[in-house]
Amino acid sequence: MKKILFPTDFSEVATNAFVHALHLADVVDGELVLLHTFQLPIVDSQFTPDNYYMIYESLQLAEFDAFKDEIPKLRAIAEKEGLADVKITHRLMDGDLVTTIQNAIKEENINFVVMGT
């Protein structure tokens, strides 16, 4: 089974690319690996507030909640396209876009990447 990485920021352009990724997955009998990346701010250790780790964790949680809220919307698009049977897995990764895409490609043994720009 072929694996297709679909990096997304959940924009309109990305949603359009998602439809194409679904159809490609259908044609090649593949599965989609949906990837959303985010980058947390870097703070100078000399000026790190005592509650920095709590702030960091709350930012991660906010990203996760936003990611989780978008998944049903993408599932609805798959159903509308008649492609609800395409397997979709989800990844949320912290880091810069290029590095996280490269890591996901290696970790997931990705065959194709489909993304909107």
Feature-to-residue mapping (PLM):
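Short secondary-structure boundary segments
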Residues: 117
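A structural signal for the hydrophobic beta-strands that form the central parallel beta-sheet
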Residues: 6, 34, 92-93, 114
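N-terminal Rossmann-like dinucleotide/flavin-binding domain of flavoprotein oxidoreductases
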Residues: 62-81
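Structural beta-alpha unit
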Residues: 75-113
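A short acidic, glycine-rich active-site loop
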Residues: 52-66
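Small/aliphatic-rich secondary-structure junction motif
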Residues: 2-54
